[in-house]
Amino acid sequence: MYRVFVFDLDGTLLNDSLEISEKDRKVIERLSRNCHVVFASGRMLVSTLNVEKKYFGRTFPTIAYNGAMVYIPEEGVILNEKVPPEVAKDIVEYVKQFNVHWQAYIDDVLYSEKDNEEIRGYAKHSSVEYRVEPKLLELVSKVGTTKILLIDTPEKLDELKKILLEKFNNVVKVFKSFPTYLEIVPENVDKGKALRFLRERMGWKKEEIVVFGDNENDLFMFEE
């Protein structure tokens, strides 16, 4: 019998207007009375929790950053993985030659080198604030980053994905969370591994879990 329900946000629960329908909200509310509800997103933790608070007035066990961060209401963040500083430096220096927008996430804060259309659009989509840091490469080279996100056309990102997988395959995972978003996260990170971590922490059985998702980054949860 299923008693744990895991929901992706963008493209799954959130509609084209980035809203959860009243019908879906009521279903999740009913589920949460007798079962466990988990949200699993590529979004920042603050962005995911904001959605939960907006529609449900509280937070739930949450997988953020495509598995790099795990949160539970009782304790806060219980998992926080990062791309190491030296790896982040190598990747950013490499992708900059392709003239693609890149952004980084440090301590659940969004950073961009430039205040451009891409970062403004992303911040609006995710309902988060951002900081412009012209020396962002220098910053990630010192402290690392939870993830790196590239934003460009689907075709350009498909090509970049192939290139990055060949060059950095042993140190990071590279996958798309949206046609125009290419995610770069620590090698040991994905939504499936984060779900396994949460399942073991909470004492849930694998056969009790059902997952809802729509994109490449959600496949790891189905495989788990």
Regions found by a protein language model. Name each.
Residues 94, 98-101, 105-221:
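Conserved acidic, metal-coordinating active-site core of Asp-based
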Residues 21-119:
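Active-site phosphate-binding/coordination module
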Residues 2-18, 91, 222:
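Asp-based phosphoryl-transfer active-site loop
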Residues 31, 66, 195, 221-222:
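Hydrophobic residues within well-ordered alpha-helices
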Residues 14-18, 39-40, 80-81, 126, ...:
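Short, flexible loop segments at the rims of nucleotide/cofactor-binding pockets, characterized by
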Residues 13, 37, 62, 184, ...:
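Conserved SAM-binding loop
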Residues 34-37, 58-60, 147, 207-208, ...:
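Short active-site oxyanion
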Residues 1, 27, 47-48, 87, ...:
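Hydrophobic alpha-helical segments typical of transmembrane helices
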